[in-house]
Amino acid sequence: MALTSEISPYNPQWPLLFTAENRRIAEGFGAELIGTHHIGSTAVPGLSAKPEIDILVVVSEHINEVARSEFMRTLGYVRGTDLSAGHHFYRRDVDGVRTHKIHVCVAGHGQIARMLRF
């Protein structure tokens, strides 16, 4: 499992990396997409963090998980174990280093508020 272990000084490119990745993944969610959020340490201006872009995707429901997972695979993502009912997880590693983590939650899931409070 590839993980980033180093904490890096804040990088002003992190919000831009979120925006670029957000555009890449949005089409894979179609009509079920409600919204996306840059979450985690890289979303906090000025905060040192592991350089992994965390994205929360809120959906109305998990309509076609197989098609979505295939789309995400074409972007270099691997679907991990569901973190709970209604909370799917994808990760992207480049050259053995974790670069992105995507949490896909059904609207109303308790983890949404927790992740947005960070």
Annotate each predicted stretch with a short phrase:
Residues 75-110:
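Conserved catalytic core of two-metal-ion nucleotidyltransferases
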Residues 24-67:
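Active-site nucleotide-donor binding segment shared across nucleotidyl transfer reactions
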Residues 3-5, 51-55, 98-100:
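Short amphipathic alpha-helical segments
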Residues 67-75:
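Short amphipathic alpha-helices in soluble, non-transmembrane regions
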